[in-house]
Amino acid sequence: MKLAAALALLATASAQLVAPALDRLPVGRIMPAGWLKAEEELMAAGSTFGLGFWSGGGISASKWLADPKKTGGEEQGGEYFMNGFVPLTCQVDSAAMRDLREAAITKILGAVGSTGMLGGDIPRDVDYDQNENYWGRMIIALALQSYAECEGPYAPNATAQDAVVDALVVHHKAMEAQIKDEQPKFTHNPWGYARYDEILISCQWLIDRGRNDSELWSLMDLVRTQADARLPWEDYFTGGDPFHPPSDVHCWPNKSDATEKNFMIHHGVNIMEAIKTGPTWYRVSGNATDLGNAATALAWIDKWERSADGTFTAPDCFAQLPNLPTNGVETCSVVEAMYSLRTSYELNADVHLFDRLEWVAFNAMPATTNDRFTGNAYYHSVNQIQLGGKSGYGANQRDDFREISTGETTKRRHRRASVGMNGCCTGNVHQGWPKFVMAQLQTADGGATIVVSGYSPFAATLPTANVSVGGQYPFADNATISVARTPGKAWKLRLRVPCWADAASLVVAGGATVDAPPCALFDVPGLAADDASFEATLLFTHSIKVLEDKWTNPKGAVEITRGPLLFSFPVPGRRNTTSLNGTYVETTFVMVDAGAPWQIALVDPTDAASLTFGGFEALTAGLPFDRDRPPAKITAKAKVTTGVKSYDKGYVPDSPVQSKYANGSVVDVDLVPLAHTYLRLTVLPVMENATEGA
């Protein structure tokens, strides 16, 4: 028996992971430029640095932060925070942030448990506090991976990085032993089993770096087997019905199931994290069905709770009355969707996944914070007529805020009255942009193929080439691409052309203009081994698109898009922002300006003549998502309504809106990118036409 076990271990240790379709570069190899750099500099000047010291969300009191006197605090908030903070320190020049990073890592490595478990020992009985569980260590492992792989001018020293890799190996071996002993079972804590993909990613990260220990393979198998028996995400995305039977819809006030499976399977953040579960497991299984499950998950999300900004209508949990544009999405769901989409795209090179990543990044992500990144929302919605309570920008707000649209139904409201907002979103929001920077470029074919996936401005350093993308995409219809390389070997340049483009063309400096077909990875023709440089401009042709069939509540409402941008009517509001005093995040509340007309209905938006794109302007220097100065607008025809009961209750009416509610003349209204709004109507009602009103 012992010999058989030993042979099994040897066989496991010699196993290999299935290679990803695209190879991700280490953090620090791709540096933000242009507006993306400006946004990350706002993070460094705002709450991403400040929360290491400020009293906000329990972050600075966490055992994962630098203060040696703090050993408790809000554990999930602290590890969430580090998961975004650490990669940011590799992308933005801030000596103060790097000092905080090093102090935190030193503290973490000095406080391991008796078996080497990060964060200290996990009690081996079944009655333990949430602050001491497997999930409490899964996220910090992702942050430590960023530290260990960080390259470039802001990287730690190699000795410290090696120590972190060693600590991660020991930590995961300790976790494997304890889970195998079921002291406690992996499924005892629901957050861990709902998000086991984080362990898969951590083990695979170590194996990819030569640490092919049998315990890592065993750990992946253990968590997959135990978690999948409780919550089989891939099967659920393939055919699950979240609303049948209705009694299964459990959220915060209704966690009656002892295993919390019903709660976990409806919780929005879990769902967004689980998008990558199948593709991540594919590296172990080699099963094409696993690889394709990310697309299956997105189709499932869009079937049940689609939202216009690429996320879903799920404030905390899937709502019992789904697909309401006034149902918000939790900030954690936004950033976890971005990370899942990036990870899945790297594994299968499906351009639809990167399109979805950009859609979330350019529309939903900016709505999670104020424009100076000094406060965050717990959730936002695509139709939002007040910014207060959990939807406001600030940490530890009291959740006495009900749904934004107070008139739709009482059954779907949920609240945790008089409870300060926990640190999840205040901690987690910081991973959004740094990990998006890392998504812009990959390699394939052992580095011989450079894959430019994103066109937000960046500069990347490869072993034999430097690649940069310039411009202000997505707030422009073009991007410049520059490659400086060491000649001598054959190479390819592969460009992702998004599916939302009507057409695209590549204008090569000193060469021809070639068509680049949308919705594909396009290999640039005519490259030679002796090329030392390459310069080109990628041009996109976009049209205004009116989506008419996406909403049944409100019936007949439309969305208006152009390229990767979703356009909203900016509801006039009165803003109240606290002063930033260096010890706490800002809070921003916005209420409707009752003296300004906002209850509009569009006039025949499907008529091309009724919608006019006004072109792009330069972004505000240093403030990419300046709410006072949107960089683009679409002028639409509309009427101002009066006496519409739905509007009086805070949500848009069904369409068509009867003409008796709008006796005035047709007026021009400006629609702007959702990313540049505080209050907004994105899902818009439509007036009845003359025939309907007859």
Give short role names for the model-derived ranges.
Residues 62-78, 119-137, 179-196, 232-280, ...:
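Solvent-exposed loop and edge beta-strand segments that line ligand/cofactor-binding
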Residues 67-71, 89-255:
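Extended ligand-binding groove/face enriched in aromatic
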Residues 503-525, 544-553:
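Solvent-exposed beta-strand/loop surfaces of large extracellular or lumenal domains
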